[in-house]
Regions:
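Ligand-binding clefts/hinges and TM-proximal coupling segments of bilobed small-molecule sensing domains
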Residues: 29-41, 89, 164-186, 223-225, ...
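A ligand-binding cleft/hinge motif common to bilobed small-molecule-binding domains
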Residues: 102, 115-124, 168-171, 195-231
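Extracytoplasmic small-molecule ligand-binding "clamshell" domains
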Residues: 34-115, 185, 269
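Periplasmic-binding protein-like
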Residues: 56-58, 133-140, 208, 212-255, ...
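Bilobed "Venus flytrap"/periplasmic-binding protein-like clamshell domains
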Residues: 53, 57-60, 71-84, 116, ...
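Acidic, polar ligand-binding/catalytic clefts
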Residues: 80, 84, 89-151, 223, ...
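Extended ligand-binding regions for polar small-molecule ligands
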Residues: 28-30, 76-85, 146, 150-151, ...
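C-terminal motif of bacterial Sec signal peptides marking the signal peptidase cleavage site
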Residues: 23-26
């Protein structure tokens, strides 16, 4: 299966875009969609055979592999429904996140879809979204007497490589976090969590939803600091210049899923406070 999207595929999806425009301009009376909002396959000239290769790493609860070996998570469920409505097949590929751009450049994947922060990266990719929001927060070991960002002075903190927290902390742009003794950039969140458990580091930073799930399994050992490191918009990233109509179509589908409550319902199914998750608070 190819990671790139062919010219023929783009032509197929252009047909879909035309149908979407009709729907958005009030022309849905022509019965172009079914009752679930799915674009009819007969209008797409076989579009259902087209796949979208989605790259992400293991980042629970957004994207992860369950005990049966299946791809699951908030982003996975959103992607499955969005692709269903577009009439295409999602193919999930686990990647090394700090090599994400090389996967895009080599056409091994079509897009990055894994709690990926748009903020500060709007010119780097072709985006669909935002489709939800996130807070970047700091988790600390309770035995290290860290109760605020100021207490991170002289402490060891870990971040995921190429993440927004890595940039913020290494650049020193946040005046609230100064004088940390060391910053460790790790390839995966699993490595980060293991280092926290073993006490190799004092604190770490990441998406609140993922961090909270980890803390809930270890409430006696860890705390989440009250301060917010960064508020971000999450989106789906495509390489610029490659079938740019697809992000536009996906963007419209994601808006529909926000408006009809689908994304909120998916978030709630993972025990998430959906009002905050959707940016309502």
């Amino acid at each position: 299966m190819r990671g790139d999207i062919s010219k023929k595929t783009c032509e197929y999806i252009l047909v879909l875009m035309m149908v979407c425009i009709l729907l958005l301009t009030g022309c849905s009376e022509s019965n172009d969609t079914d009752e679930d909002g799915m674009i009819k396959a007969e209008e797409s000239s076989g579009i259902s055979s087209v796949s979208l290769v989605i790259g992400s790493d293991n980042y629970e609860p957004y994207n992860y592999i369950d005990e049966s070996g299946e791809n699951v998570g908030i982003d996975v469920d959103i992607a499955k429904e969005a692709c269903r409505r577009m009439g295409i097949t999602p193919v999930f590929k686990q990647i090394t996140w700090d090599r994400k751009d090389s996967f895009l450049d080599s056409n091994e994947i079509d897009c990055l879809w894994g709690s990926f922060t748009m903020s500060g990266r709007t010119d780097d990719y072709r985006w669909a979204g935002p489709y939800m929001y996130s807070r970047q927060v700091v988790i600390a070991r309770k035995d290290r007497e860290i109760n605020s960002f100021a207490d991170l002075k002289g402490k060891r903190i870990a971040v995921q490589s190429t993440s927004k927290p890595e940039h913020i902390i290494l650049s020193g742009e946040d005046d609230r976090i100064q004088g940390v003794s060391a910053v460790y950039s790790m390839s995966t969140m699993s490595e980060l969590y293991a280092s926290l458990r073993k006490g190799y580091i004092d604190a770490a930073a990441g998406h609140e939803v993922a961090i909270k799930r980890f803390v809930d399994t270890n409430p006696q050992q860890f705390i989440i600091l009250d301060e917010t490191l960064y508020k971000s918009e999450l989106g789906v990233a495509f390489k610029k210049g490659r079938c740019d109509d697809i992000p536009d179509i996906l963007n419209d589908i994601l808006k529909q899923m926000i408006d009809d409550g689908t994304i909120k319902k998916i978030a709630e199914s993972y025990g998430i406070n959906a009002d905050i998750f959707m940016g309502d608070n």
